[in-house]
């Protein structure tokens, strides 16, 4: 509906001028155009091509968001909306400890938001958002409520969840916020204390130690021909993806081609059920389907989005957290392909591509999107 209304509204010259001023959004638009151009040489079946075509267009919501949010008030409201959504998610997570909720399909507190991994990473970002609002806030009551929300979200990530990626992104996001928000005189001490707390959490949690220990064992026990573990399957996908890239390095195998290409290096049907959908690595995924051209456009988009916030001012804190978390999560997950990740990152990516000064001339007194 958002895209349809933007199309029906017209005003193409104004929209094009706005898009050209936002280089990250323009880079993403060019990237998506390249994806669909690759249908000319794709090796995908008709079914796979249709599924891929119905997935990648959602990325166009990112430039749509940058066109629609043109003042500081709406940036602030959108971040508040994300926070409200995470509070609602936390309410469901803790309520499931006492009763069943009919509209939650899994019934598990770790899988309320479609997918356990995206849920834990989303709560990790929310934890960082809470810290960003606590630091420098003079309202003690508000600080107290934010601290309660931070503890609730952190407990959901570190104790209720069993996701290694969630643990790592929680630590990464919280540390980055402290590095960006604290004054230089307090920065080293604050980060040192935070690192110490992370170490205490790790040493005091048998579950976290067990999950990381299991990951190390799975990596050590990996065998190319037959491995069904979480880490082993990923290693197999990545190795096969690199081989697939080498056979079509520049243009790739085309839109929706990964399942067809992956069947060649997944001899076991059970492993193919897991690994023939996507390679659990956003960079290799784009490399296989869209070649070095598509991968280069993706990296260019990330780079342009990050340098928008190179001034490291207050408004850059959460966008940089989102971009770093998405970039790191993309090393082990297909963060712009799988639905659970798309629901999380597409709206946040749109917010993160907005310049810290976008809309200041219209509403200069409303300059606090992190609130």
How would you name each of these model-derived features?
Residues 224-239, 243, 247, 251-290:
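Long extracytoplasmic/lumenal interhelical loops at the membrane interface
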Residues 6-14, 36-93, 328:
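Transmembrane alpha-helical segments and their membrane-water interfaces
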Residues 16-30, 74-82, 143-146, 313-322:
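Membrane-interfacial loop-to-transmembrane alpha-helix junctions, especially the N-terminal start
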Residues 179, 188, 289-324:
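Hydrophobic transmembrane alpha-helices and their immediate junctions
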Residues 1-9, 52-62, 118-127, 167-175, ...:
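Membrane-embedded alpha-helical segments of multi-pass membrane proteins
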Residues 74-105, 114-182, 193, 203, ...:
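Alpha-helical transmembrane segments of multi-pass inner-membrane proteins
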Residues 160, 181-224, 239-247, 255:
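A membrane-periplasm/extracellular boundary helix in multi-pass inner-membrane enzymes
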Residues 2-6, 174, 301, 319-329, ...:
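Transmembrane alpha-helices of multi-pass inner-membrane enzymes
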